[in-house]
């Protein structure tokens, strides 16, 4: 909850801005908690982007995007909330490479189609991330 405390102090008495929260690994736990807390304070969440938040339930009334270093992490994490769009590295990469070298990570962008099926498109993590922020 340190994130939320920081935001409360920074924006005390001001109009609360819309936030895009980017989180990595164990930080995803604090990020999803802060996102919910921010909304309870009257703020808006534009998106939450979770890099390798394995085992963290991600549910919200705002866009959530999961990024995983391999297919197993992608699949097993999706049981706790898929999010709107997701990406997994294929071939698998080291956990830290997601953060360190997104331009070198190749994998699959996964989105739900209008008929509820998954669409898989190959791209780099950098391309996927740029699409999210566009």
Task: Give short role names for the model-derived ranges.
Residues 1-16, 67-75, 81-134:
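Active-site catalytic motif of lipid deacylating hydrolases and related acyltransferases
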Residues 2-86:
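Serine-dependent carboxylesterase/thioesterase catalytic core
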């Amino acid at each position: 909850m340190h994130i939320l405390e920081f935001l409360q102090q920074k924006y005390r008495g001001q109009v609360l801005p819309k936030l895009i929260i980017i989180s990595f690994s164990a930080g995803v736990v604090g990020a999803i908690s802060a996102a919910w807390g921010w909304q309870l304070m009257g703020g808006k969440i534009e998106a939450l982007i979770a890099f390798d938040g394995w085992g963290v339930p991600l549910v919200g009334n705002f866009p959530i995007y999961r990024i995983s270093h391999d297919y197993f992490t992608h699949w097993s994490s999706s049981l706790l909330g898929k999010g709107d769009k997701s990406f997994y590295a294929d071939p698998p990469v080291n956990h830290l490479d997601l953060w360190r070298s997104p331009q070198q990570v190749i994998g699959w962008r996964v989105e739900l189609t209008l008929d509820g099926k998954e669409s898989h498109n190959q791209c780099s993590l950098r391309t996927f991330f740029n699409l999210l922020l566009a």
